[in-house]
Amino acid sequence: MTKTDIIIAIDPDIDGSGVAVFYMSTKLFQVGNMTLPKLVDFLKDKKGWCEGEGFSLIVVIEASYLVSANWHLSWDDSRNRAAAKGRQVGRNHEIGRQIAEFCKYLDIPYEEKLPLKKCWAGKDGKISHDELMQLMKGMDLPAWTGRTNPEIRDAMLLALDRSGLPLRMKR
């Protein structure tokens, strides 16, 4: 894993992918949710800016489509509910594949990363806002003052994982 100046981590989603840009030199984040068209424009702009400034860039995409088996059903789901869940999961997987395809087309270095283990206290094992703040504090990173949603938190966690910095919690 080579060191990079800027890490763009993406948690693909139909309604708006979570995007976290981590600047290694300042240890600062830029985060938000973007639809696929806006994300493609953002990646083009960021690539051009990095080339002009002489920074290296990598895009990390959470690639849940690489997991061979995902179980999203509960015991009381009807057939219609099961079909709707499967359709939604498939649509999210396709967004991730399309982001990877755009990166390839735009000649932007990217990695497809298996989802990180869900070992947090938040809903469905996802990281909560408080846990993310504790993690950033434990890593001596500047505190994040804005609000976050699950997609943004997952993207931030992906970026921190890719950064190579030791992940430490501070309670």
Give residue ranges: language-model regions.
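Phosphate- and other anionic-substrate recognition elements at nucleic-acid/protein interfaces
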Residues: 2-171
